[in-house]
Amino acid sequence: MYRNKEASWWPRRHPSRRRVPRGLEAWLDEPGSLTARLRRSVPGGLEVTVLVERWGRPSIDEARAVELSDGRHARIREVLLGSRDQAWIYARTIMPPEALAGDGRRLARLGRTPLGGALFRGRTVARGPLSIARLGPRDPLAARVPGGGAGCWARRSRLWYGNAGLLVTEVFLPPLLQSLED
């Protein structure tokens, strides 16, 4: 475990997992596209709401995770994924400039297209190790989530697309947990 301003991220098999709500473990461990899983689970069809899609400076922790030197900008994308009425997932993606070269150019302006749909469609994508966290009230990541993300579980991993890695962080929101209880 390492501590930083963002969150305390643990390897996915850390003992803290014993506190993960029932049913959420399968979502945290999803090895493939979370988008595909959402498409199967969200009633009425999956909707993507774009919150942010711009160039900017990732947090120090995020920059380290994608091996971006201090002060360099990356493409930052924040979206809500869920039904028309309720968000189930808040996702934040950090895309270094190298990830947007060549075939990756289309990732720079996805709009309402889910990242998973664009990445996993007929392409070879490798996922790095998954890390999990439970967001605290002072985590800047929790503050980015509309309505607040304190107490929510999150996962993050590096997705390798060609020679460059993206950092994808996904926060599991209360409506998803409610759907698991139904």
Curated annotation (Swiss-Prot):
Lyase recorded as keyword: yes
EC number: 4.1.3.40
Subcellular localization: Cytoplasm
Functional pathway: Cofactor biosynthesis; ubiquinone biosynthesis
The keyword Secreted is annotated on this UniProt entry: no
InterPro entries assigned to the protein according to its UniProt record, in alphabetical order: Chorismate--pyruvate_lyase, Chorismate_lyase_/UTRA_dom_sf
Gene Ontology molecular function: any one: chorismate lyase activity
EC class of the enzyme, as a word: lyase
Binding sites annotated in the UniProt record for substrate: R77, L115, E170
A Gene Ontology term for the protein's cellular component: cytosol
Keywords on record: Cytoplasm, Lyase, Pyruvate, Ubiquinone biosynthesis
Main location: cytoplasm
Enzymatic reactions: chorismate = 4-hydroxybenzoate + pyruvate
Alphabetical GO biological process terms: pyruvate biosynthetic process; ubiquinone biosynthetic process
Function: Removes the pyruvyl group from chorismate, with concomitant aromatization of the ring, to provide 4-hydroxybenzoate (4HB) for the ubiquinone pathway.
Record family assignment: Belongs to the UbiC family.
Protein name (Swiss-Prot/TrEMBL): Probable chorismate pyruvate-lyase
Organism name: Alkalilimnicola ehrlichii (strain ATCC BAA-1101 / DSM 17681 / MLHE-1)
Gene this chain is encoded by: ubiC
